[in-house]
Amino acid sequence: MNTTAASVCLLAAIAAGAAPIASAAPEVEVLHFWTSGGEARSVAELKKALNAKGVAWKDFAVAGGSGENASTALKARVISGSPPAAAQVKGPAIQEWGKEGVLANIDAVAVAEKWDTLLPPAVAGIMKYKGSYVAAPVNVHRVNWLWVNPAVLKKAGAKAPTTMDEFFVAADKIKAAGMIAVAHGGMPWQDTTVFESVALGVGGADFYKKALVQLDQAALTGPLMLKTFDTLGRIKTYIDRDSAGRDWNLATAMVINGKAGMQFMGDWAKGEFNAAGKNPGTDYLCLPAPGTAKAYTFNIDSMLMFKKPKAEDQKSQLLLASAIMSPQFQEVFNLNKGSIPVRAGVSKAKFDSCALQSMDDLDSTSKAGTLVPSLSANMAVGTAAQGAIMDVIARFMNSKMSSQDAVTALAKAAKTK
Protein backbone atom coordinates (compact mmCIF):
# COMPACT_ATOMS: atom_id res chain seq x y z
CA MET A 1 0.00 0.00 0.00
CA ASN A 2 1.37 3.43 -0.94
CA THR A 3 1.73 6.14 1.68
CA THR A 4 -1.19 8.40 0.77
CA ALA A 5 -2.73 11.36 2.53
CA ALA A 6 -5.10 8.92 4.17
CA SER A 7 -2.14 6.95 5.51
CA VAL A 8 -0.56 10.10 6.90
CA CYS A 9 -3.78 10.94 8.72
CA LEU A 10 -3.97 7.39 10.01
CA LEU A 11 -0.44 7.50 11.38
CA ALA A 12 -1.24 10.75 13.15
CA ALA A 13 -4.12 8.93 14.80
CA ILE A 14 -1.82 6.07 15.76
CA ALA A 15 0.70 8.46 17.30
CA ALA A 16 -2.10 10.10 19.27
CA GLY A 17 -3.29 6.79 20.64
CA ALA A 18 -6.15 6.29 18.19
CA ALA A 19 -9.14 6.77 20.47
CA PRO A 20 -11.96 4.24 20.01
CA ILE A 21 -14.33 5.05 17.19
CA ALA A 22 -17.85 6.00 18.25
CA SER A 23 -19.60 4.71 15.12
CA ALA A 24 -19.63 1.10 13.95
CA ALA A 25 -16.05 -0.06 14.30
CA PRO A 26 -14.10 -1.27 11.28
CA GLU A 27 -13.26 -4.95 11.40
CA VAL A 28 -10.12 -6.99 10.82
CA GLU A 29 -10.28 -10.73 10.25
CA VAL A 30 -7.34 -12.61 11.76
CA LEU A 31 -6.49 -16.24 11.00
CA HIS A 32 -4.45 -17.90 13.75
CA PHE A 33 -3.80 -21.19 15.52
CA TRP A 34 -3.52 -19.94 19.09
CA THR A 35 -6.17 -22.17 20.65
CA SER A 36 -4.72 -23.70 23.84
CA GLY A 37 -5.47 -22.24 27.28
CA GLY A 38 -2.38 -20.06 27.58
CA GLU A 39 -2.57 -19.05 23.92
CA ALA A 40 -6.25 -18.10 24.18
CA ARG A 41 -5.41 -15.73 27.03
CA SER A 42 -2.76 -14.15 24.82
CA VAL A 43 -5.18 -13.71 21.91
CA ALA A 44 -7.63 -11.99 24.25
CA GLU A 45 -4.95 -9.38 24.95
CA LEU A 46 -4.43 -8.75 21.24
CA LYS A 47 -8.18 -8.28 20.83
CA LYS A 48 -8.13 -5.73 23.66
CA ALA A 49 -5.23 -3.85 22.12
CA LEU A 50 -6.98 -3.73 18.75
CA ASN A 51 -10.31 -2.69 20.25
CA ALA A 52 -8.54 0.16 22.03
CA LYS A 53 -7.56 1.46 18.59
CA GLY A 54 -11.18 1.37 17.44
CA VAL A 55 -11.03 -1.83 15.38
CA ALA A 56 -13.16 -4.92 15.94
CA TRP A 57 -11.53 -8.36 15.87
CA LYS A 58 -13.08 -11.06 13.66
CA ASP A 59 -11.73 -14.37 14.89
CA PHE A 60 -10.65 -17.08 12.43
CA ALA A 61 -9.10 -19.66 14.76
CA VAL A 62 -7.94 -22.99 13.34
CA ALA A 63 -6.80 -25.57 15.90
CA GLY A 64 -3.51 -27.41 15.43
CA GLY A 65 -0.32 -26.43 17.21
CA SER A 66 1.92 -26.74 14.15
CA GLY A 67 -0.15 -24.38 12.04
CA GLU A 68 -0.58 -26.96 9.28
CA ASN A 69 -4.38 -26.80 9.45
CA ALA A 70 -4.29 -23.01 9.49
CA SER A 71 -1.99 -23.00 6.46
CA THR A 72 -4.43 -25.19 4.54
CA ALA A 73 -7.32 -22.89 5.44
CA LEU A 74 -5.29 -19.83 4.42
CA LYS A 75 -4.43 -21.30 1.02
CA ALA A 76 -8.11 -22.01 0.37
CA ARG A 77 -9.08 -18.44 1.21
CA VAL A 78 -6.34 -16.91 -0.93
CA ILE A 79 -7.21 -19.14 -3.89
CA SER A 80 -10.86 -18.11 -3.55
CA GLY A 81 -9.82 -14.47 -3.80
CA SER A 82 -10.91 -13.62 -0.27
CA PRO A 83 -7.90 -13.77 2.06
CA PRO A 84 -8.21 -12.69 5.69
CA ALA A 85 -6.73 -9.30 6.52
CA ALA A 86 -4.01 -10.96 8.60
CA ALA A 87 -2.79 -14.49 9.21
CA GLN A 88 -0.35 -16.11 11.61
CA VAL A 89 2.46 -16.98 9.19
CA LYS A 90 6.19 -17.12 9.85
CA GLY A 91 9.67 -17.78 8.57
CA PRO A 92 10.33 -18.74 4.94
CA ALA A 93 6.57 -18.98 4.29
CA ILE A 94 6.45 -15.17 4.36
CA GLN A 95 8.75 -15.06 1.34
CA GLU A 96 6.75 -17.80 -0.40
CA TRP A 97 3.55 -15.78 -0.04
CA GLY A 98 5.39 -12.67 -1.20
CA LYS A 99 6.24 -14.35 -4.48
CA GLU A 100 2.51 -14.87 -5.06
CA GLY A 101 1.95 -11.11 -5.09
CA VAL A 102 -0.78 -11.18 -2.45
CA LEU A 103 0.84 -9.32 0.46
CA ALA A 104 0.12 -5.83 1.75
CA ASN A 105 2.92 -3.31 2.29
CA ILE A 106 2.81 -1.95 5.86
CA ASP A 107 5.82 0.37 5.61
CA ALA A 108 3.53 3.31 6.42
CA VAL A 109 3.35 2.24 10.05
CA ALA A 110 6.73 0.50 10.24
CA VAL A 111 8.64 3.59 9.11
CA ALA A 112 6.59 5.98 11.25
CA GLU A 113 7.20 3.85 14.35
CA LYS A 114 10.87 3.15 13.49
CA TRP A 115 10.67 -0.64 13.49
CA ASP A 116 14.16 -0.90 12.02
CA THR A 117 15.58 0.52 15.24
CA LEU A 118 13.28 -1.47 17.54
CA LEU A 119 13.83 -4.92 16.03
CA PRO A 120 16.98 -7.05 15.78
CA PRO A 121 18.18 -6.96 12.15
CA ALA A 122 17.65 -10.72 11.73
CA VAL A 123 14.03 -10.36 12.83
CA ALA A 124 13.37 -7.30 10.68
CA GLY A 125 14.67 -9.17 7.64
CA ILE A 126 12.21 -12.01 8.17
CA MET A 127 9.30 -9.54 8.38
CA LYS A 128 10.12 -7.93 5.01
CA TYR A 129 9.59 -8.93 1.41
CA LYS A 130 11.82 -7.17 -1.13
CA GLY A 131 12.80 -4.60 1.47
CA SER A 132 9.31 -3.66 2.64
CA TYR A 133 7.52 -4.76 5.80
CA VAL A 134 4.64 -7.14 5.15
CA ALA A 135 4.35 -8.71 8.62
CA ALA A 136 4.36 -7.61 12.25
CA PRO A 137 6.40 -9.74 14.69
CA VAL A 138 4.61 -10.73 17.88
CA ASN A 139 7.22 -12.45 20.04
CA VAL A 140 10.28 -14.65 20.28
CA HIS A 141 9.98 -18.22 21.50
CA ARG A 142 12.88 -20.45 22.49
CA VAL A 143 12.22 -23.98 21.26
CA ASN A 144 15.12 -25.91 22.81
CA TRP A 145 13.64 -26.20 26.31
CA LEU A 146 13.16 -29.20 28.57
CA TRP A 147 10.24 -28.80 30.99
CA VAL A 148 10.61 -30.76 34.20
CA ASN A 149 8.39 -31.52 37.20
CA PRO A 150 10.75 -31.39 40.23
CA ALA A 151 8.28 -33.35 42.38
CA VAL A 152 8.53 -36.25 39.93
CA LEU A 153 12.33 -36.05 40.05
CA LYS A 154 12.27 -36.09 43.84
CA LYS A 155 9.92 -39.07 43.95
CA ALA A 156 12.17 -40.95 41.51
CA GLY A 157 15.41 -39.92 43.24
CA ALA A 158 16.60 -38.24 40.05
CA LYS A 159 18.45 -34.99 39.30
CA ALA A 160 17.61 -32.33 36.72
CA PRO A 161 19.64 -33.18 33.59
CA THR A 162 21.97 -30.84 31.73
CA THR A 163 23.60 -33.41 29.43
CA MET A 164 22.11 -36.24 27.41
CA ASP A 165 23.82 -38.82 29.61
CA GLU A 166 22.23 -37.22 32.67
CA PHE A 167 18.89 -37.15 30.85
CA PHE A 168 18.91 -40.90 30.33
CA VAL A 169 19.89 -41.51 33.96
CA ALA A 170 16.93 -39.39 35.08
CA ALA A 171 14.59 -41.03 32.56
CA ASP A 172 15.54 -44.50 33.79
CA LYS A 173 14.83 -43.53 37.39
CA ILE A 174 11.47 -41.94 36.55
CA LYS A 175 10.45 -44.99 34.55
CA ALA A 176 11.56 -47.32 37.36
CA ALA A 177 9.41 -45.32 39.80
CA GLY A 178 6.33 -46.11 37.71
CA MET A 179 5.89 -42.76 35.97
CA ILE A 180 6.21 -41.67 32.35
CA ALA A 181 9.66 -40.23 31.73
CA VAL A 182 8.90 -38.20 28.60
CA ALA A 183 5.54 -36.55 27.89
CA HIS A 184 5.04 -36.32 24.14
CA GLY A 185 2.40 -35.95 21.47
CA GLY A 186 2.84 -38.17 18.45
CA MET A 187 2.52 -35.55 15.72
CA PRO A 188 5.17 -34.80 13.07
CA TRP A 189 5.88 -31.28 14.35
CA GLN A 190 6.26 -32.50 17.93
CA ASP A 191 8.51 -35.34 16.78
CA THR A 192 10.61 -32.76 14.96
CA THR A 193 10.74 -30.53 18.04
CA VAL A 194 12.47 -33.34 19.93
CA PHE A 195 14.65 -34.20 16.92
CA GLU A 196 15.99 -30.67 16.43
CA SER A 197 16.89 -30.29 20.10
CA VAL A 198 18.72 -33.61 19.98
CA ALA A 199 20.55 -32.58 16.79
CA LEU A 200 21.58 -29.30 18.41
CA GLY A 201 22.80 -31.10 21.53
CA VAL A 202 24.67 -33.77 19.59
CA GLY A 203 26.34 -31.61 16.96
CA GLY A 204 26.18 -28.00 18.13
CA ALA A 205 25.01 -24.89 16.30
CA ASP A 206 27.39 -25.18 13.32
CA PHE A 207 26.21 -28.72 12.56
CA TYR A 208 22.59 -27.65 13.05
CA LYS A 209 22.96 -24.79 10.56
CA LYS A 210 24.65 -26.94 7.94
CA ALA A 211 22.23 -29.85 8.25
CA LEU A 212 18.87 -28.28 9.07
CA VAL A 213 19.10 -24.78 7.58
CA GLN A 214 21.50 -25.07 4.64
CA LEU A 215 20.47 -28.70 4.03
CA ASP A 216 24.09 -29.61 3.33
CA GLN A 217 24.25 -33.21 2.13
CA ALA A 218 27.57 -33.95 3.85
CA ALA A 219 26.15 -32.89 7.21
CA LEU A 220 22.86 -34.70 6.60
CA THR A 221 24.61 -37.99 5.86
CA GLY A 222 27.51 -37.76 8.32
CA PRO A 223 28.20 -39.42 11.68
CA LEU A 224 26.62 -36.63 13.74
CA MET A 225 23.27 -37.15 12.02
CA LEU A 226 23.54 -40.88 12.60
CA LYS A 227 24.21 -40.20 16.29
CA THR A 228 21.22 -37.85 16.36
CA PHE A 229 18.89 -40.61 15.20
CA ASP A 230 20.50 -43.13 17.54
CA THR A 231 19.81 -40.76 20.44
CA LEU A 232 16.27 -40.01 19.25
CA GLY A 233 15.59 -43.72 18.98
CA ARG A 234 16.61 -44.15 22.59
CA ILE A 235 14.41 -41.25 23.73
CA LYS A 236 11.31 -42.70 22.11
CA THR A 237 11.54 -45.76 24.38
CA TYR A 238 10.60 -43.47 27.30
CA ILE A 239 7.39 -42.21 25.66
CA ASP A 240 4.08 -43.86 26.60
CA ARG A 241 2.14 -45.96 24.10
CA ASP A 242 -0.84 -43.60 24.08
CA SER A 243 1.08 -40.64 22.65
CA ALA A 244 -0.22 -40.90 19.07
CA GLY A 245 -2.17 -37.79 18.08
CA ARG A 246 -1.87 -36.17 21.51
CA ASP A 247 -1.96 -32.37 21.45
CA TRP A 248 1.16 -30.69 22.80
CA ASN A 249 -0.70 -28.94 25.61
CA LEU A 250 -2.10 -32.26 26.83
CA ALA A 251 1.47 -33.56 27.00
CA THR A 252 2.40 -30.45 28.98
CA ALA A 253 -0.52 -31.17 31.31
CA MET A 254 1.03 -34.58 32.02
CA VAL A 255 4.11 -32.80 33.38
CA ILE A 256 1.99 -30.26 35.26
CA ASN A 257 -0.06 -32.93 37.05
CA GLY A 258 2.90 -35.20 37.81
CA LYS A 259 1.96 -38.01 35.46
CA ALA A 260 5.19 -37.45 33.52
CA GLY A 261 8.58 -36.04 34.40
CA MET A 262 9.88 -34.19 31.34
CA GLN A 263 8.83 -32.69 28.02
CA PHE A 264 10.80 -31.33 25.06
CA MET A 265 8.82 -28.28 23.95
CA GLY A 266 9.13 -24.59 23.15
CA ASP A 267 8.35 -22.02 25.79
CA TRP A 268 4.73 -21.71 24.75
CA ALA A 269 4.47 -24.62 27.21
CA LYS A 270 5.10 -22.11 29.98
CA GLY A 271 1.79 -20.48 29.17
CA GLU A 272 0.11 -23.74 30.21
CA PHE A 273 2.01 -23.84 33.51
CA ASN A 274 1.03 -20.22 34.13
CA ALA A 275 -2.61 -20.89 33.29
CA ALA A 276 -2.53 -23.72 35.84
CA GLY A 277 -1.20 -21.36 38.52
CA LYS A 278 2.26 -22.95 38.67
CA ASN A 279 5.48 -21.13 39.52
CA PRO A 280 8.90 -21.60 37.90
CA GLY A 281 11.66 -22.98 40.09
CA THR A 282 9.25 -24.63 42.52
CA ASP A 283 6.40 -26.24 40.58
CA TYR A 284 8.37 -26.69 37.37
CA LEU A 285 11.85 -26.25 35.92
CA CYS A 286 12.75 -24.71 32.58
CA LEU A 287 16.06 -26.11 31.40
CA PRO A 288 17.84 -25.84 28.06
CA ALA A 289 17.42 -29.17 26.28
CA PRO A 290 20.33 -31.47 27.22
CA GLY A 291 23.59 -30.25 25.72
CA THR A 292 22.12 -27.05 24.25
CA ALA A 293 22.71 -24.47 26.99
CA LYS A 294 24.94 -22.33 24.77
CA ALA A 295 22.61 -22.35 21.75
CA TYR A 296 19.10 -21.07 21.04
CA THR A 297 16.55 -22.29 18.50
CA PHE A 298 14.15 -19.44 17.84
CA ASN A 299 10.56 -19.27 16.71
CA ILE A 300 9.03 -15.90 15.88
CA ASP A 301 5.27 -15.61 15.64
CA SER A 302 4.16 -12.95 13.18
CA MET A 303 1.02 -11.57 11.59
CA LEU A 304 1.27 -11.45 7.81
CA MET A 305 -0.89 -8.87 6.06
CA PHE A 306 -2.74 -9.67 2.83
CA LYS A 307 -3.88 -7.23 0.15
CA LYS A 308 -7.38 -5.91 0.72
CA PRO A 309 -9.14 -3.64 -1.81
CA LYS A 310 -11.01 -1.42 0.66
CA ALA A 311 -9.21 1.55 2.21
CA GLU A 312 -10.95 0.86 5.53
CA ASP A 313 -9.47 -2.64 5.66
CA GLN A 314 -6.03 -1.29 4.82
CA LYS A 315 -6.26 1.20 7.69
CA SER A 316 -7.34 -1.58 10.05
CA GLN A 317 -4.29 -3.62 9.05
CA LEU A 318 -1.97 -0.74 9.94
CA LEU A 319 -3.71 -0.32 13.28
CA LEU A 320 -3.35 -4.05 13.95
CA ALA A 321 0.36 -3.86 13.14
CA SER A 322 0.77 -0.85 15.42
CA ALA A 323 -1.07 -2.60 18.25
CA ILE A 324 1.14 -5.68 17.92
CA MET A 325 4.33 -3.65 18.16
CA SER A 326 3.25 -1.48 21.09
CA PRO A 327 5.35 -2.05 24.25
CA GLN A 328 2.21 -2.45 26.35
CA PHE A 329 0.90 -5.28 24.19
CA GLN A 330 4.33 -6.89 23.85
CA GLU A 331 4.58 -7.07 27.63
CA VAL A 332 1.15 -8.48 28.47
CA PHE A 333 0.96 -10.84 25.47
CA ASN A 334 4.31 -12.42 26.17
CA LEU A 335 3.63 -12.72 29.89
CA ASN A 336 0.62 -14.85 28.97
CA LYS A 337 2.21 -16.70 26.06
CA GLY A 338 5.42 -17.77 27.77
CA SER A 339 7.56 -16.05 25.15
CA ILE A 340 9.61 -12.84 25.29
CA PRO A 341 9.12 -9.46 23.57
CA VAL A 342 10.56 -9.18 20.10
CA ARG A 343 11.17 -5.42 20.24
CA ALA A 344 13.35 -3.16 22.36
CA GLY A 345 11.95 -0.88 25.04
CA VAL A 346 9.72 -3.32 26.93
CA SER A 347 10.01 -3.51 30.73
CA LYS A 348 11.44 -6.76 32.11
CA ALA A 349 10.06 -6.18 35.62
CA LYS A 350 7.14 -8.61 35.43
CA PHE A 351 8.91 -11.43 33.59
CA ASP A 352 9.82 -14.60 35.48
CA SER A 353 13.14 -16.42 35.76
CA CYS A 354 12.51 -18.55 32.66
CA ALA A 355 11.80 -15.49 30.52
CA LEU A 356 14.79 -13.59 31.90
CA GLN A 357 17.03 -16.57 31.11
CA SER A 358 15.58 -16.66 27.61
CA MET A 359 16.30 -12.94 27.16
CA ASP A 360 19.87 -13.32 28.38
CA ASP A 361 20.48 -16.41 26.25
CA LEU A 362 18.98 -14.76 23.17
CA ASP A 363 21.47 -11.93 23.57
CA SER A 364 24.49 -14.15 24.27
CA THR A 365 23.78 -16.67 21.49
CA SER A 366 23.13 -13.88 19.01
CA LYS A 367 26.59 -12.49 19.78
CA ALA A 368 28.20 -15.95 19.73
CA GLY A 369 26.62 -17.00 16.44
CA THR A 370 24.74 -19.91 18.02
CA LEU A 371 21.24 -18.49 17.48
CA VAL A 372 19.50 -20.77 14.97
CA PRO A 373 16.00 -20.97 13.43
CA SER A 374 13.67 -23.76 14.52
CA LEU A 375 12.94 -26.42 11.93
CA SER A 376 9.80 -27.68 13.66
CA ALA A 377 8.38 -24.16 14.03
CA ASN A 378 8.60 -23.35 10.30
CA MET A 379 11.56 -20.99 10.62
CA ALA A 380 14.45 -22.87 8.99
CA VAL A 381 13.58 -24.10 5.48
CA GLY A 382 10.86 -23.86 2.84
CA THR A 383 7.57 -25.65 3.35
CA ALA A 384 8.18 -28.40 0.78
CA ALA A 385 11.51 -29.53 2.24
CA GLN A 386 10.25 -29.09 5.78
CA GLY A 387 7.23 -31.29 5.17
CA ALA A 388 9.33 -34.05 3.61
CA ILE A 389 11.89 -33.91 6.44
CA MET A 390 9.20 -34.03 9.12
CA ASP A 391 7.61 -37.04 7.44
CA VAL A 392 10.89 -38.94 7.71
CA ILE A 393 11.29 -38.06 11.38
CA ALA A 394 7.70 -39.09 12.11
CA ARG A 395 8.21 -42.42 10.32
CA PHE A 396 11.32 -43.05 12.38
CA MET A 397 9.46 -42.27 15.59
CA ASN A 398 6.59 -44.58 14.71
CA SER A 399 8.33 -47.60 13.22
CA LYS A 400 11.37 -49.82 13.52
CA MET A 401 13.25 -47.83 10.87
CA SER A 402 16.99 -47.99 11.52
CA SER A 403 19.05 -44.88 12.16
CA GLN A 404 20.99 -45.43 8.95
CA ASP A 405 17.81 -45.77 6.89
CA ALA A 406 16.51 -42.59 8.51
CA VAL A 407 19.70 -40.72 7.60
CA THR A 408 19.40 -41.86 3.98
CA ALA A 409 15.72 -40.90 3.81
CA LEU A 410 16.37 -37.53 5.46
CA ALA A 411 19.06 -36.61 2.95
CA LYS A 412 16.68 -37.44 0.11
CA ALA A 413 13.82 -35.51 1.70
CA ALA A 414 16.01 -32.42 2.03
CA LYS A 415 16.17 -32.21 -1.78
CA THR A 416 12.39 -31.74 -2.04
CA LYS A 417 11.46 -28.53 -3.84
Go through the PLM ranges and name each one:
Residues P92-V143, F168, V194-E196:
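Hinge/lid segment of periplasmic solute-binding proteins
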Residues A76-R77, P83-A85, W115-A151, I180-A181, ...:
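A structural signal for short loop-to-beta-strand junctions that line the ligand-binding cleft
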Residues P26, K48, A52-K53, A156, ...:
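Extracytoplasmic/periplasmic substrate-recognition and gating elements
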Residues D107-P121, G125, G186, V202-K227, ...:
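Short, solvent-exposed loop/beta-turn-alpha elements that line the ligand-binding surface or hinge
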Residues Q214, M303, G345-V346, M359-A414:
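C-terminal capping/gating helix-and-loop segments adjacent to ligand/active sites or protein-protein/ligand interfaces
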Residues A171-K173, Q214-A244:
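Glycine-centered hinge/linker elements that transmit conformational signals in sensory
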Residues I21-E100, A112-W115, A160, A244, ...:
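Conserved N-terminal structural module of periplasmic/extracytoplasmic solute-binding proteins
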Residues K130-V138, F168-Q217, A260:
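Extracytoplasmic/periplasmic solute-binding protein
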